[in-house]
Amino acid sequence: VTTSGPLQPGLVYETRTTDYLNYLCYIGLDIDGIKAIAKTIPNDFACPKDSNSDYVSNINYPSIAISKFDGKASKNISRTVTNVGGDGKTVYAVSVDAPSGIVVKVIPDQLTFTKNNEKLSYQVIFSSSTATSLKEDVFGSITWTNGKFKVRSPFVVSSKSGDNDEYVL
């Protein structure tokens, strides 16, 4: 990834072809359905065995959409970021702006990069502080900061299922 000047983001979320293909699996398409709309598919690609719409949130985008949140079970997602800040060694600390009733935990709470273009992953765990389902969609954000860059990832948590072809990233 090459970035410079005012478009320098600090961290980037790279999304690969397999991320998009997995997304199609998660929303219910099989290999034949994917081949009908995708120009090229890697020869070794197969839909994950446990594909279902619960995994739509795992596409490696900066934004996060959690559906079917009933307040009883936590929802876990993971993200991978690439350090493109140009400083090589740097540490990003996380801050979370969570809506009332939602607990958001980020693991780890710091990303320590030792070089440019290094990739690190983190996990976000969404749980309810009230153990009840949501009455409406709620919004918040996760922000990674190293003193030079702020990288914000907005999120939405919904009790809706998304089963009506309303898949949002």
Describe the residue ranges of each PLM region.
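Loop-rich non-cytosolic ectodomains and luminal regions
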Residues: 1-169
